[in-house]
Amino acid sequence: DYGMRAVKSVLDAAGNLRRKHPDMNEASTVLTAVNQINRPKFLIDDLALYSGIIGDLFLNVEEPVQDNSLLVRAIEEVGLAQNVHNHPAFLNKILELREMILVRHGLMIVGDPLSGKTCCYTMLQEALSLLNARKELPCDLNPKHELKTDVFVINPKSISMGDLYGYNDLVSQEWSDGVLSKIYRAASACASHSDNRKWIVFDGPVDAVWIENMNTVLDDNRKLCLVSGEMLPMSQYMNMVFETLNLDQASPATVSRCGMVYMSAPDCTTSAARGNTENPGNNALLNEAAWVPHVRAWLNTMPAVVSRNPVLVETIVLLYKWAIPPLVNLMTDELKSCQMLPASGIAMVHAVNRMFGCVLQTHWASAAAEEE
């Protein structure tokens, strides 16, 4: 999508950059804005082509480095508290999500299961709330951007359209708010006495059955139109976030109205794995950066006899590095036809964690009994 909505988003991003960095030259401002809007929605293999096109359009123009040190430190603190390893690729996705939220009131986070979609926006929420709590510190905070954030999560496919948007009772003809209309009404009303950001997250498949009624919310009207004839306005601190696996059933009209952040699990895979066109799922975990953080986070939850023993932790990680790649290749190649349900490589790693944890706990219990 490179229509007028995309152009307007680039102009909004450029305006924000101009106000934040008035000394930045115009070419660098436009280049940074274009990258902020377009880079998050590309696959890892498409970024090289995109970078080449941008390099031809902006000759001898360098993109200035953005100072996000305050937000990065807050994200690292949140990651430490939530037992999340802040891999550079994942940290970059969080920053991309934050930039997208500032220029688009509707956005989609697309990715496979366990690719970090939920963790991405929850960590950003906690980091922004943490920065907001530190307003008394001598920090260069933008009160419009670093605000305490409230999140409301809805599964749109778990309820009917009437329960989602609201309905008129057939007998009494009285209007009853649905889940979305009730949350939307409360979030819009809070704007008059609260500056907290409100994110309404739709965690589920995106299809034309329920999302077409959101078109007036996602475009410049920013109003939720109910079947009762009521129109609920959206405040400037509200965002509609769609967390979904893919956009196969979404219409182009809906996609063009939203910003896009693609959480690609193969972001950390090797070029050799990405070049395997016969079986895209094969070798998806050859690069350790894609799955070792999951193992280290799991080891942090183990008893102190393991988590506080760095030698034992590194030994277990080395065993995983030796065993996981061939096991994943075996499951995705030779045993693929035996799987009742397809599983991603990260899901297989989590399954190994659970089974290995059971073995270790049995061993520790017997060892403790012998010591007693």
Features from the language model and the residues they span:
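Short glycine-/polar-rich loops that comprise or flank the Walker A/P-loop
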Residues: R104-H105, E146-D150, N196-R197, N221-R222, ...
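Conserved RecA-like P-loop NTPase ATPase core
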Residues: G3, L97, L164, M214, ...
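Conserved catalytic/switch belt of AAA+ P-loop NTPases
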Residues: S129, D169-H193, R197-E243, A265-P266
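Walker A/P-loop nucleotide-binding motif
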Residues: R104-M123, V206
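Alpha-helical lid/collar subdomain of P-loop NTPases
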Residues: D1-L107, L114, G275-E372
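A short helix-turn-beta junction within AAA+ P-loop NTPase domains corresponding to the substrate/partner-engaging
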Residues: T149, D219-D220, A250-A304
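AAA+/P-loop NTPase substrate/partner-engagement loops
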Residues: A127-S172
